[in-house]
Amino acid sequence: MNIIPTCQVPKDLVSAFFQKHWGSPQMVISSGIYNCDELDGYGMLNDDNQIVGLITYIFEEDACEIISLDSVIENKGIGTALLEKAEEACRERNIKQIKLITTNDNIHALAFYQKRGYRLDRLFVNAVETARKMKPEIPLLADNKIPIRDELLLVKELQ
């Protein structure tokens, strides 16, 4: 499997990936509205040149915000490899902090990031209600039956 910058992945593949996994390439979170198929990032492709993992992020003045991280095949190191690649891109730019926002229902992501050194930093109560006004396809309930209401900011200081 190959990790390559998203700018080298055909845009129609990236757009289709987000359509399938998120309902659209648009991500609405408390930090802004993003078209993920236009962001910097990395994709992991299998031998058939199909996307099996994708990370997107934006660089701010002194930090990097991960906007999306998806792995089609769980527990194979894809998410970890993509996250490490994004952290490496931050270090190359001398960025010392990387952060992300996830929702309260995303127990798997909360565990994944904390195991990799990310800390809970802030809670945005009812933030998903605001996001749902801009992107109504955001469900009320997650697959695990937890109501999707709040956003959590996780932060990691890079060495």
Curated annotation (Swiss-Prot):
Regions that span the bilayer: none
Domain N-acetyltransferase: 1-139
InterPro entries: Acyl_CoA_acyltransferase, GNAT_dom, N-term/lysine_N-AcTrnsfr
PROSITE patterns per record: GNAT
GO molecular function, one term: acyltransferase activity, transferring groups other than amino-acyl groups
Listed CDD domains: NAT_SF (cd04301)
Protein name: Uncharacterized protein YxbD
Lineage: Bacteria, Bacillati, Bacillota, Bacilli, Bacillales
